[in-house]
Amino acid sequence: MSNRLSVVMIAKNAADLLPDCLGSVSWADEIIVLDSGSTDNTVELARRLGAQVYTHTDWRGYGIQRQRAQDYATGDWVLMIDTDERVTPELRQAILKVLDAPQRGAIYSIARRNYFLGRFMRHSGWYPDRVLRLYERARYRYNDNLVHESLDSLGAEVIPLTGDLLHLTCRDFAGFQQKQLAYAAAWALERHQKGKKTSMAGIFSHTLGAFLKTLLLRGGVLDGKQGWLLAMVNAQYTFTKYTELWALSHGYSEKESS
């Protein structure tokens, strides 16, 4: 007998993304959507498309919210995805094979193909961009990180799956930038609360390093114009998060008290 699969996702104001996302996983045994306080019709649309919808508006970070969503699942295995991701037919077949004969205790990694300004990137550190997304529900949990959360793998064997997970990372550059700013602020606050600091030299060395790593070490130059642009975006993101950390450590930012 095949194991039951719960597809789990967190959502906020994702009505434009849900139809394609949920359509790509309609074959799952159950779909769990945890809404974070949408003001559009995300909740109604998700229910209409067959998902079980719950709400938690007291946002405490991505890791906690993902685990809250997982706690509603009842399947033997969890496939954790985002609303801007789509499961390809090849990936679906790979997942179904795992459910028929899983390797107990293993976690399965999935290759993401990230979309940036009209192009699915093939280099730049954005492909294959493997993420741990398919695992036994009762065995694994998410950590409590505010941002860049991860599954506590407990040293488990990681097995790569065939097939890609399409990720619409940047359809709208302004919206993408807003999200990057939020991630950078959360990253800096988390590091500051752990007593981490940086210097002016650290800010600029990390910024330059991010640009060169994306463009040269990770082959961004092979992604054409988008590769160059992504290298600059990564440098900007790195500059923002280290500058915010510097500001927090010097008392020049009010984020900590807000």
From Swiss-Prot:
Copy the pathway line from the protein's UniProt record: Bacterial outer membrane biogenesis; LPS core biosynthesis
Q: Which UniProt keywords apply?
A: Glycosyltransferase, Lipopolysaccharide biosynthesis, Transferase
- Xref: Pfam families: Glycos_transf_2
User: GO MF annotations for this entry?
Assistant: glycosyltransferase activity
Please tell me whether the keyword Cell membrane is annotated for this protein: no
Q: Which EC numbers characterise this protein's activity in its record?
A: 2.4.-.-
Glycosyltransferase among keywords: yes
* Biological process per Gene Ontology, one example term: lipopolysaccharide core region biosynthetic process
Q: Which family does it belong to?
A: Belongs to the glycosyltransferase 2 family. WaaE/KdtX subfamily.
The molecule here is called Lipopolysaccharide core biosynthesis glycosyltransferase WaaE
Q: Which organism is it from?
A: Klebsiella pneumoniae
Q: What is the lineage of its organism?
A: Bacteria, Pseudomonadati, Pseudomonadota, Gammaproteobacteria, Enterobacterales
Gene behind the chain: waaE
